[in-house]
Structures are given as C-alpha cells and as structure tokens.
C-alpha cells in the first residue's frame, strides 16, 4: 500500500477529550473518529488492526472446537422476558420498537437468542457437546462512556456459548475456553491473567476475567507475581485431552479482582515480596451458569434414559474492539504505538527519505515490489514530507519494522532497518532487509 493513496488523517496535536494513552494515540494515528458519545467510525488503519485481532480470536475459537455462526444485532424483547432479564438488565439496554410496535432491543449479549436457536433444533444428548460463537457488534448504553474504545457504547465482541448435558461436561467446555483465551491473548503479545470474578448480570457461580495489567485499567486486582511467569499452552495443545492440570496450574496461584478479593487469604498465601496490588484492563470473561437460561426457556434434551433435562450452559466473551486499546496501553512509548507483529496494520514501512531523487525512488520502488512479491504486508511512504515528519509518523502508527532509504546510505548500497519495539537499528543491503522480513 502506498501512503500517498492511503487514508491516514494523522493529528498533530493531542486531542483534548482523550484521557488515556490508547484513546489519544488512536485518535492521533487516524485509527478512529468519534461520531457520538462512545460510538466510533473505524478508519482504514484502525480497521486493519481490528480485523487482525478478530482473525486471531477466530482461529483460536476454531482450534478449540467451537463453531462460528452469526446472530443479528436486534433481538425480540419477548426472548429476554422468558429468561427474566428484560426488566433486570437496566438502562444499559437500548430498547426500541419497529413500525408494527413490536418490542426489540439492540443486543448487549446473546444468551437468550442462542438458547432459542439451540432449543429449536437440538433434542437429544447425542448432539452434545456443542459450542457456538459469533463475532458481532453490540451496544450497551453506558451512562458515562469514556476512554475511547475501552469503554464505548458500541463495541465488537466475540461471544461463545456452550451446551452440555451436565455440570461435569460443562466444566470441560469451560476449561477449553480457558485455555483458548490464554493462547488468544498470548498470540497478540499480551500477558492476560485469568482471575476469579463476579458473574454480574450474566449469572452463574463460576467466572474468570482475563486481565491485562495497566495503570489505566478500571479493575483493581490482587495477584501473586508468580502468575506472571506461568507458561501459556503451545499450538500443539490437545483440546480433547484432560486440560485440568493446566487450569489448576493457573488457578492455584492467587489472582483476583477487587470484587472477589479475599484480603486474609492473600496475606496468608502470598509472601509479601510477591504481592502485587495494581490495576488492569479486562479483555475477556468466561462464565459457567448451569441451567440459568435453559430452565426458564425450556431448552431441554433427552438424556440417555430418555428423560428430558435442561442443558448446562456457559458463555465466553472477548472484547475484540477493546483489545486495540488494551494492546496500546501495554505497548507504547512517548513517540507512539509499538504494535506486536501479529496485530500490526502493516509488518513494515518503507521510508523514502528523498522523494524525487531518481536513485532513491528506484530503490524504494524495487524494495517495495520485492516485499509485496514475498507476501510481506508493507506500507510505502512515498509522500513528499520531510524525513523528520516521516520518522515521526512511522513511530506514531507503530509499524514493527521501518526500512529507511536515503541517498547517503544508498551510495554504499545500504539501507537502514529499524525495529520499532526496541529502537534498534542495523545497516544492511536491500536484499538482506528483504530476507530479514521474510524469514
């Protein structure tokens, strides 16, 4: 992609409305534009990152055995009345009526609808276990939306829903999602810590939030520092095996949100030197809620003895759009964003340091074409901006690798390769730069 043809409305000044780093950098880098309180348009740069995050989430859900579908954003109010949540959910739910006076709502979550889909088709335990997920926009009418995409009213979310015959089988599904979430966030360059948490309006008696530590986080957390060093399961993890040892390894080390924090246990179990009381950002939450929805909505299956029983359910959410903010909070410096390679909008940017110089232009074009031919996702800054402005823009938008080509280095047949994550620089031939990025 040539920058001269890319829509990248970079802001020179820090937006006054931005309270935290991620909001400020997303606005400055031309990733989003606020259209209303808590509602954002996703501009090309931000949308590229959003789609990469979404794809990682999708791949790990598929790997765990979950099946993707897509449910609508609008839901019938009657479904929520069946579950008893229509009046209980509160003013965060956007309630609307169509021209025929039918009551609808803009879904803040999908437990009711997925249960309705399940009960329409699944009648026997032989069709279990089943885990269905979708990635869809949701709306919650936050009283005070703030912090950009971290606490918006409209947001993109992955929510999965498991259906099992009994509690033991439902715990197996819960464990699969627990491991899938560990892998999902690790692939994005994040250390997300699972912590016991309140179940809130979703309900149930078991829940874990996945928290990324950050001073700007809204959640107070208490952890044993040992949890920071626990290994994340690799790509070869067998989801059909017993995952209990992995779950025990992660849950046996103290980690809790402030809502369920046990101060006495924390002091008793955790040596003082390993205690950490800080703040964090919730990027995902998983729930086991048993028969909370299946009983009132009569989602039943015939068991092995032929008797109908309510299914045991779980739900599993990831804040896909919120993850952009969380990643930036964890990966930035004073100059801008430092994207982990897996989610970066581009892997590399070619910086033409003297636009109009025939030799430099030709070298940039050649390198740009070679990288594209090798499958490298590359941005070519072919604008007529001065070199300093190009450096600043490249640092701001956070592309992992910068390839700088100017007349001085080119006279020696060299280009400069900069790694954004640590600022390290190397001088090498264009061919070596291509090999480094392809390898």
UniProtKB/Swiss-Prot annotation:
It is found in: Cytoplasm. GO terms for biological process: prolyl-tRNA aminoacylation. One of its GO terms (cellular component) is cytosol. It comes from the Bacteria. The keyword Protein biosynthesis applies. It catalyses: tRNA(Pro) + L-proline + ATP = L-prolyl-tRNA(Pro) + AMP + diphosphate. CDD domains: ProRS_anticodon_short (cd00861), ProRS_core_prok (cd00779). Belongs to the class-II aminoacyl-tRNA synthetase family. ProS type 2 subfamily. Catalyzes the attachment of proline to tRNA(Pro) in a two-step reaction: proline is first activated by ATP to form Pro-AMP and then transferred to the acceptor end of tRNA(Pro). This is Proline--tRNA ligase. It comes from Bradyrhizobium diazoefficiens (strain JCM 10833 / BCRC 13528 / IAM 13628 / NBRC 14792 / USDA 110).
């Amino acid at each position: 992609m040539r920058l001269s043809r890319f829509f990248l409305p970079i802001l020179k000044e820090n937006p006054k409305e931005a309270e935290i780093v991620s909001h400020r950098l997303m606005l400055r880098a031309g990733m989003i534009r606020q259209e209303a309180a808590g509602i954002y348009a996703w501009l090309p740069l931000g949308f590229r990152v959003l789609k990469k995050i979404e794809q990682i989430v999708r791949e790990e859900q598929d790997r765990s055995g979950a099946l993707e579908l897509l449910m609508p954003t609008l839901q019938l109010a009657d479904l929520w009345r069946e579950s008893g949540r229509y009046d209980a959910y509160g003013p965060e739910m956007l309630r609307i009526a169509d021209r025929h006076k039918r009551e609808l709502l803009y879904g803040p979550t999908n437990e009711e609808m997925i249960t309705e889909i399940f009960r329409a088709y699944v009648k026997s335990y032989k069709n279990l276990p089943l885990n269905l997920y979708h990635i869809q926009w949701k709306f919650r009418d936050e009283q005070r939306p703030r912090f950009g995409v971290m606490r918006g009213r409209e947001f993109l979310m992955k929510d999965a829903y498991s259906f099992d015959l009994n509690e033991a089988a439902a715990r197996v599904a819960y464990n699969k999602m627990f491991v899938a979430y560990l892998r999902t966030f690790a692939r994005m360059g994040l250390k997300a810590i699972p912590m016991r948490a309140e179940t809130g309006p979703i309900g149930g008696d078991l829940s874990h939030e996945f928290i990324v530590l950050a001073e700007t986080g809204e959640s107070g957390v208490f952890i044993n520092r040992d949890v920071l060093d626990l290994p994340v399961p690799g790509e070869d993890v067998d989801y059909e095996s017993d995952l209990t040892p992995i779950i025990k390894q992660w849950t046996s080390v103290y980690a809790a949100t402030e809502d369920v924090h046990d101060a006495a246990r924390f002091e008793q179990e955790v040596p003082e030197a390993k205690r950490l009381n800080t703040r964090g950002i919730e990027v995902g939450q998983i729930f086991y809620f048993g028969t909370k929805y299946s009983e009132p909505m009569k989602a039943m299956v015939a068991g092995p003895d032929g008797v109908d029983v309510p299914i045991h359910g779980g739900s599993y959410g990831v804040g896909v759009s919120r993850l952009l903010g969380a990643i930036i909070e964890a990966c930035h410096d004073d100059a801008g964003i430092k994207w982990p390679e897996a989610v970066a909008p581009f892997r590399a940017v070619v910086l033409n340091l003297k636009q109009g110089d025939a030799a430099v232009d030709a070298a940039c074009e050649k390198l740009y074409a070679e990288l594209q031919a090798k499958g490298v996702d590359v941005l070519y800054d072919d604008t007529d901006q001065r070199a300093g402005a190009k450096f600043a823009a490249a640092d701001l938008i956070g592309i992992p690798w910068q390839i700088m080509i100017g007349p001085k280095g080119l006279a020696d047949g060299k280009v400069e390769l900069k790694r954004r994550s640590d600022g390290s620089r190397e001088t090498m031939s264009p061919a070596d730069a291509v090999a480094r990025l392809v390898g």
